[in-house]
């Protein structure tokens, strides 16, 4: 069992928002108090490498946070399309500016309640066998430093890691279920969920919607999830609405080309 429960972890550290990477970046920004305006300074700088160096001197020991906010690497090179920057979620920087969070953001509840207990259990074993599958996506589909082969490897500390299900596809899994008449948990078979993780975790983009699916069966669970993660659910809804409005605005601007005349612009004689 974890030394710290989910409720205490969230109270002490904060609530996840959008993704673990986004949560870590925003947690650092909140703790360090770095102004969002550094992103504008970097964007407007002619010499971005020099500006990045200057920001590093102005805000020491904040390298990852500077890179996160400015969407760049430590050399000052723009990196707008990688997962480690704030705008990996479209318009997130502008949204945070216009609607700053009134709660602490963090994904450390995952470390406290899942990762640390797992590490404590597995540290004395020679081999660690886990059930990750590549088709689950996310970090599980990306090669890791200790596991370039993905299915089997030896780590730097002498342990072996084995993922026997890694190359089992969703199609394989469906065949196996039908062939052997396997019944999934009620979460899938009755409640209608497509994938589960920590109950109510806001990292899932449809966490709040999934809670409504299980409300008729688990009303107390739904109530508890809202008490723990509710601020993140509401903030996610605000962000989704903001993103939708911005995308519609951009689409409208692209349709209206400056200088282009329409049929109704011509004066009838």
How should these model regions be labeled?
Residues 158, 170-269:
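ATP/NTP-dependent adenylation/nucleotidyl-transfer catalytic domains that generate, transfer
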């Amino acid at each position: 069992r974890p030394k710290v429960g989910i409720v205490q972890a969230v109270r002490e550290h904060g609530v996840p928002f959008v993704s673990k990477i986004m949560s870590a970046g925003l947690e650092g920004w909140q703790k360090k108090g770095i102004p969002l305006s550094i992103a504008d300074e970097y964007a407007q700088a002619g010499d971005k490498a020099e500006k990045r160096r200057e920001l590093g001197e102005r805000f020491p020991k904040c390298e990852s946070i500077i890179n996160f906010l400015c969407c760049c690497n430590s050399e000052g090179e723009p990196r707008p399309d990688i997962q480690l920057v704030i705008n990996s979620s479209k318009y997130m920087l502008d949204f945070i500016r216009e609607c700053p969070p009134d709660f602490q953001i963090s994904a450390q509840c995952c470390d406290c309640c899942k990762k640390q207990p797992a590490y404590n259990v597995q540290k004395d074993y020679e081999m660690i066998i886990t059930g990750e599958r590549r088709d689950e996506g996310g970090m599980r589909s990306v090669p890791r430093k200790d596991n370039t082969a993905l299915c089997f490897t030896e780590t730097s500390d002498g342990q072996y890691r084995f993922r026997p299900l890694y190359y089992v596809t969703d199609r394989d899994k469906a065949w196996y279920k039908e062939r052997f008449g396997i019944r999934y948990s009620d979460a899938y078979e009755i409640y209608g969920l497509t994938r589960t993780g920590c109950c109510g975790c806001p990292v899932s983009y449809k966490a709040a919607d999934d809670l409504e699916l299980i409300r008729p069966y688990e009303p107390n669970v739904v109530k508890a999830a809202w008490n723990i993660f509710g601020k993140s659910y509401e903030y996610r809804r605000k962000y989704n609405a903001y993103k939708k409005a911005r995308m519609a605005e951009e689409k409208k601007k692209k349709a209206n080309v400056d200088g282009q005349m329409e049929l109704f612009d011509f004066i009838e004689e």
